[in-house]
A protein has these predicted regions:
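RNA-interacting cores
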Residues: 1-144
Length: 144
């Protein structure tokens, strides 16, 4: 996907409610969210090709909200997963496919898309700037 400087880029935010089927400790939550998102890509050949292609995916997501004080996300509770992308088709995928998706630990419930208002960024903070996946798997297991 190539963006021209003169084109107004829209940023889509998807807020998804998810239900936990098992307790998940905070240091494993990124891995489980990634598995949840990845498993949805496998339901459609076009999205599977997108997933398997070695390229920037143009989306990011955060930790679940609310964060638990004891650092364990609880089985039986509903949390919010926020995903952002500049690709409208990808935003639609997250809204339509992920809500019907589930893995052993996570089940998607409902999602909504909104366009974030344009504003000038003064500072950018992120806890997960990039996730790297090699032929051997995700960076945490394959590179470190």
């Amino acid at each position: 996907m190539v963006f021209e400087r003169s084109v107004l880029m829209k940023v889509y935010q998807i807020r998804m409610e998810i239900f936990l089927l098992e307790d998940i400790v905070i240091n494993k939550i990124q891995e489980k969210i990634t598995a949840f998102i990845d498993s949805g890509f496998k339901t459609d050949e076009e999205w599977l090709n997108f997933h398997e292609k070695n390229s920037f995916k143009n989306y990011c997501y955060d930790q679940l909200y609310p964060v638990e004080n004891d650092r364990v996300y609880k089985k039986g509770k509903i949390y919010t997963l926020t995903i952002r992308t500049v690709d409208l088709e990808l935003a639609k995928y997250f809204k339509l496919v992920c809500v019907d998706n589930h893995i052993k630990e996570i089940k998607g419930l409902v999602a909504e898309i909104r366009v974030l208002p344009k504003k000038i960024l003064e500072t950018v903070y992120t806890l997960t700037p990039m996730i790297i996946k090699t032929e051997k798997g995700y960076w945490k297991e394959a590179i470190s």
